[in-house]
Swiss-Prot record:
It is an enzyme of class 1 (oxidoreductase). It is a single-pass membrane protein. Keywords: Acetylation, Endoplasmic reticulum, FAD, Flavoprotein, Isopeptide bond, Magnesium, Membrane, Microsome, Monooxygenase, NADP, Oxidoreductase, Transmembrane, Transmembrane helix, Ubl conjugation. FAD binds at G9, A10, G11, V12, S13, E32, V40, W41, N61, T62. Its main location: membrane. GO terms for molecular function: flavin adenine dinucleotide binding; N,N-dimethylaniline monooxygenase activity; NADP binding. It comes from the Eukaryota. NADP(+) binds at T60, N61, S195, G196, S197, D198. It is found in: Microsome membrane; Endoplasmic reticulum membrane. The gene is FMO2. The chain crosses the membrane at residues 510-530. GO terms for biological process: energy homeostasis; NADP metabolic process; negative regulation of fatty acid oxidation; organic acid metabolic process; oxygen metabolic process; toxin metabolic process; xenobiotic metabolic process. It comes from Homo sapiens (Human). Expressed in lung (at protein level). Expressed predominantly in lung, and at a much lesser extent in kidney. Also expressed in fetal lung, but not in liver, kidney and brain. This is Flavin-containing monooxygenase 2.
Length: 535
């Protein structure tokens, strides 16, 4: 008999967990508290309690080729960076293709997940749910928690003396939907992550003035990288990841600083991070520097105090007549349906083996999917997590001892603090390519480069120097997909397809730039031999 698995949430992590369960012959049931799939990526005009919320203009920060699921490329005519509605369309196509909706119970809230009395031998869980006011319970062999970590708004009001005196409007960025109603106002955005920057840029087009307060500064990157390709298809390669791992930390930090300042000098714009040697996640925004140049946005330091109508900053400057304050100060998370002893959240941190498994359980039948912030796309990350977890549930992969897992958790946390710092917003941060490879190794899906160099050198070179996308993890091992190799070699075609909307005459393959390179090489050779002749 197939093992029954409860999947909590039908967002990105929940959908891919359903598919992985089906792929492994498990019997999943997904509980989704709302009426539809999509999680945080499904825009709604009104904020709902217990549900993630986005603003209407949200666009992905990771490109389609680096974000799609490993055996299901996005349509080639989809733009490279997707509006939330377009991404939701992809999820709907995905769910329909793999017939996932039949496993989902919508408008069903999970009230509790408790160990069964014989858990030490069975590993089973009693799950209590509520739908239309009626409670039900069922026993499952395993549970996948896919409820996300962008639900509880973090508003540190006590950190802002005088907040109680402020007479203007204030709210968390979670409540922001669109710029209507903010025309002509003087607005202060506190926090300069991706959401804070997006909101500041959008409001600055019609507001009287927008100020953005950043405590430590930040790097700002464009979505557009070398030769106009998406940033992550250039940044996330195995070769670059190797360099970041083997070079001295100072050299890596210097390289990152040079790369970030290539677009614009952050020091001149008042944005340079206070501690440049901490690997803080950069802000992805194509408009911030231009809005700063136009004066529509002004960067400010930390807010020291608020009065009835003004903000006083740590550097002594004061901005008067503030109408609105928006707190883009991130989120905290919790699991109210779980006992604290199962997944304990302290200071926005959880102690999970590889960000997935509680280490102390007698049976490894509870897993958290998507409770992580990789320096890359969450979608392939959650997929590899789910692929590994379902194989653990099935007994095809095993976990080490509790002691070994706890040592790994401690070591990983120390490394995270060393790389990313101790900020509450960085508690789930991890390197991207390294983590994907780590999970793939557990599954048996990591490509063997030494073997490929002899069997398929063209593919080996592409895997090492090209974009590290999800298709690579379908080349070998469990879940192997025969279309993976072709998907890797045709990704450039899918990147360029939505851009080629104007017909151009075919240009000669023997381009002027190529000719200049040949002439330059010949000039170097001639100069070398001339030097030998005269020496």
């Amino acid at each position: 008999m197939a093992k029954k698995v409860a999947v909590i949430g039908a967002g990105v992590s929940g959908l891919i967990s359903l598919k992985c369960c089906v792929d492994e012959g498990l019997e999943p049931t997904c509980f989704e508290r709302t009426e539809d799939i999509g999680g945080v990526w499904r825009f709604k005009e009104n904020v709902e309690d217990g549900r993630a919320s986005i603003y209407q203009s949200v666009v992905t920060n990771t490109s389609k080729e680096m974000s799609c699921f490993s055996d299901f490329p996005m349509p080639e005519d989809f733009p490279n960076f997707l509006h939330n509605s377009k991404l939701l369309e992809y999820f709907r196509i995905f769910a329909k293709k793999f017939d996932l909706l039949k496993y989902i119970q919508f408008q069903t809230t999970v009230l509790s997940v408790r160990k069964c009395p014989d858990f030490s031998s069975s590993g089973q869980w009693k799950v209590v749910t509520q739908s239309n006011g009626k409670e039900q319970s069922a026993v499952f062999d395993a549970v996948m928690v896919c409820s996300g970590h962008h639900i509880l708004p973090h508003i540190p009001l006590k950190s802002f003396p005088g907040m109680e005196r402020f007479k203007g409007q204030y709210f968390h960025s979670r409540q922001y939907k669109h710029p209507d109603g903010f025309e002509g106002k003087r607005i202060l955005v506190i926090g300069m992550g991706n959401s804070g920057s997006d909101i500041a840029v959008e409001l600055s087009k019609n507001a009287a003035q927008v100020f953005i307060s950043t405590r430590h500064g930040t790097w700002v990157m464009s979505r557009i990288s070398e030769d106009g390709y998406p940033w992550d298809s250039v940044f996330h390669t195995r070769f670059r990841s190797m360099l970041r791992n083997v070079l001295p930390r100072t050299a890596v930090k210097w390289m990152i600083e040079q790369q970030m300042n290539r677009w614009f000098n952050h020091e001149n714009y008042g944005l340079e991070p206070q501690n440049k040697y901490i690997m803080k996640e950069p802000v992805l925004n194509d408009d911030v520097p231009s809005r700063l140049l136009c004066g529509a946005i002004k960067v400010k330091s930390t807010v020291k105090e608020l009065t009835e109508t003004s903000a006083i900053f740590e550097d002594g400057t004061v901005e008067e007549n503030i109408d609105v304050i928006i707190f883009a100060t991130g989120y905290s998370f919790s699991f109210p349906f779980l006992e604290d002893s199962l997944v304990k959240v302290e200071n926005n941190m959880v102690s999970l083996y590889k960000y997935i498994f509680p280490a102390h359980l007698d049976k490894s039948t509870l897993a958290c999917i998507g409770l992580i912030q990789p320096l890359g796309s969450i979608f392939p990350t959650a997929e590899l997590q789910a692929r590994w977890v379902t194989r653990v549930f099935k007994g095809l992969c095993s976990l080490p001892s509790e002691r070994t897992m706890m040592m790994d958790i401690i070591k990983r946390n120390e490394k995270r603090i060393d790389l990313f710092g101790e900020s509450q917003s960085q508690t789930l941060q991890t390197n991207y390519v390294d983590y994907l490879d780590e999970l793939a190794l557990e599954i048996g899906a990591k490509p063997d480069f030494c073997s490929l160099l002899f069997k398929d050198p063209k593919l080996a070179v592409r895997l090492y120097f090209g974009p590290c996308n999800s298709y690579q993890y379908r080349l070998v091992g469990p879940g192997q997909w025969e279309g993976a190799r072709n998907a890797i070699f045709t990704q450039k075609q899918r990147i360029l397809k939505p851009l080629k909307t104007r017909a151009l005459k075919d240009s000669s393959n023997f381009s002027v730039s190529f000719l200049l390179k040949i002439l330059g090489l010949l000039a170097v050779v001639v100069a070398f031999f001339c030097q030998l002749q005269w020496s």
